[in-house]
UniProtKB/Swiss-Prot annotation:
Entry's Gene Ontology BP terms: ribosome disassembly
Protein name, UniProt field: Translation initiation factor IF-3
Any one GO cellular component localisation term in the record: membrane
Subunit and partners: Monomer.
C-alpha cells in the first residue's frame, strides 16, 4: 500500500474509511449523540441516507458527523472561493512628473493619484530631469513636497523622495481606514 498523497490527506475520511473502533457522533441536526461504535454510527448514517464524515480526526475519540458529503464539499469550495474573492491585490501605479509640469497637468495627475489611492493601490511618483534640469533639483523637490501636502488626508509616504540617476522617486500608500 503506497503512502497517501497530499490530496487524500486534505480530504476528510468518510464511511468505511473511518477505521477507529469508536467515535463521538454528531447527528443530522447537529446534536451530540455521544460516543458510539463506528459500526453503529455507520448504520445510523445509512438509515438516514447520508454519509458519516470525520470532522476532527485528532480528537480522542475522533468527531464524526452524519451529513451529505457532496453538499459538504460544495459548501467548503464556496467558502474558499468567497475568501479568494475578498482578497485584494495591491498594485503599484506609477505617475510621471517633470520639474516643469504646469498647474493644469499637475491637477489632472493629482486627481488620478487620489483615485488610485482611494482604490487601495500604492503610487510610485517618478520625477524625471532632462539635460540641465539636474542643476535645479530643488524644483523637483518642491513638486514632491506639494504632492505630499495635497494628498496628506488620503496618503502616507511609504518611501521618501530619493534620487536614482536622473530621477527623484517617492512612493505613497493609502492611509489605513478603520
Amino acid at each position: 500500500m503506497s503512502a497517501p498523497t497530499k490530496r487524500e490527506n486534505d480530504r476528510a475520511r468518510i464511511n468505511e474509511q473511518i477505521t477507529v473502533p469508536e467515535v463521538r457522533l454528531i447527528d443530522v441536526d447537529g446534536n451530540q449523540a455521544g460516543i458510539v461504535s463506528t459500526r453503529e454510527a455507520l448504520r445510523a448514517a445509512e438509515e438516514s441516507g447520508l454519509d458519516l464524515v470525520e470532522i476532527s480526526p485528532t480528537a480522542k475519540p475522533p468527531v464524526c458527523r452524519i451529513m451529505d458529503y457532496g453538499k459538504f464539499l460544495f459548501e467548503l469550495s464556496k467558502k474558499q472561493a468567497e475568501a479568494r474573492k475578498k482578497q485584494k491585490q495591491i498594485q503599484v501605479k506609477e505617475l510621471k512628473f517633470r520639474p516643469t509640469t504646469e498647474d493644469g497637468d499637475y491637477q489632472v495627475k493629482l486627481r488620478n493619484l487620489i483615485r488610485f489611492l482611494n482604490h487601495g493601490d500604492k503610487v510610485k511618483i517618478t520625477l524625471r530631469f532632462r539635460g540641465r534640469e539636474m542643476a535645479h533639483q530643488e524644483l523637483g523637490m518642491k513638486i514632491l513636497e506639494r504632492l505630499q501636502a495635497d494628498t496628506a488626508d488620503v496618503a502616507v509616504v511609504e518611501q521618501h523622495a530619493k534620487r536614482e540617476g536622473r530621477q527623484l522617486l517617492m512612493v505613497l500608500s493609502p492611509k489605513k481606514t478603520k
